[in-house]
């Protein structure tokens, strides 16, 4: 594809030979001749003098240290993401039902649906137009799946789950399994509580590999429109997220916690149950959230605190060994002063009553 053609498809300006041929995309460090790369920040400009890329995507108005063909736009990362789609398309199943798939006669399929080998689709399921069900997927009864969804290999969709349009469910994800509900009994054992609710994924939700989203005991576990969930995330029963949240790998959210819109949960953070997390909250990696967080805050640490306070705490923590040594020295000095004070006390008492301590000691 020629440089000018790429610029036209991306709707951006270009500089350099309009007939320059580009055949793929790559990072600046790994690019070879014929490949397109991008530069997201000015601090990476020195890499331009080392890269073998034939062209790069850069920000409008950014001065370059060397002569290289480029595409210019306001958001180089977005343009690069769009450029990837010009050269690469993910695998799609051929339309139709594979002979080894097991499909209940009551299932309703839209136009252009593809169902791969050994998939199982149980009674009462409805699948929208152009949705793809990849190999070994299991869909339990009375599930609703929208149009243009991708359910990748080995994921499991449990009964009564509702999935909107344009959703991606990656390999090994489990949607709608029982929530973790158990009641303590007098003898110290636990009684399992059936989970009669369901999970709802609104439109354009993405769920990563080996992530689990549990159904509610009653009511719904709901993932808001446009929310993106990474791999290995656990979302407990009754959780509700707003729209366009970002939940990174190994996050755990306990039951009935509610997230506002545009919340970001960084990797390995944990949220206790029955909390309310306001709109626009950002939670740093490995944070333990134990109480409600007001809208707009960025928090870190365990227990969580505003990130500015956490940074101050971390700055002090780095000096703890030095502070400990100083404290021990101070303790030793105080102990010595106290001992000296104790040694002088009897002599001071003798002077008060007119007795000479030296004479007393001599006799």
UniProtKB/Swiss-Prot annotation:
One of its GO terms (molecular function) is structural constituent of carboxysome shell. Keywords: Acyltransferase, Lipid A biosynthesis, Lipid biosynthesis, Lipid metabolism, Repeat, Transferase. It catalyses: a UDP-3-O-[(3R)-3-hydroxyacyl]-alpha-D-glucosamine + a (3R)-hydroxyacyl-[ACP] = a UDP-2-N,3-O-bis[(3R)-3-hydroxyacyl]-alpha-D-glucosamine + holo-[ACP] + H(+). GO terms for biological process: lipid A biosynthetic process. GO terms for cellular component: carboxysome; membrane. It is an enzyme of class 2 (transferase). It holds the Pfam family Hexapep. The keyword Cell membrane does not apply. Its EC number is 2.3.1.191. Catalyzes the N-acylation of UDP-3-O-acylglucosamine using 3-hydroxyacyl-ACP as the acyl donor. Is involved in the biosynthesis of lipid A, a phosphorylated glycolipid that anchors the lipopolysaccharide to the outer membrane of the cell. This is UDP-3-O-acylglucosamine N-acyltransferase. It comes from Synechococcus sp. (strain JA-2-3B'a(2-13)) (Cyanobacteria bacterium Yellowstone B-Prime).
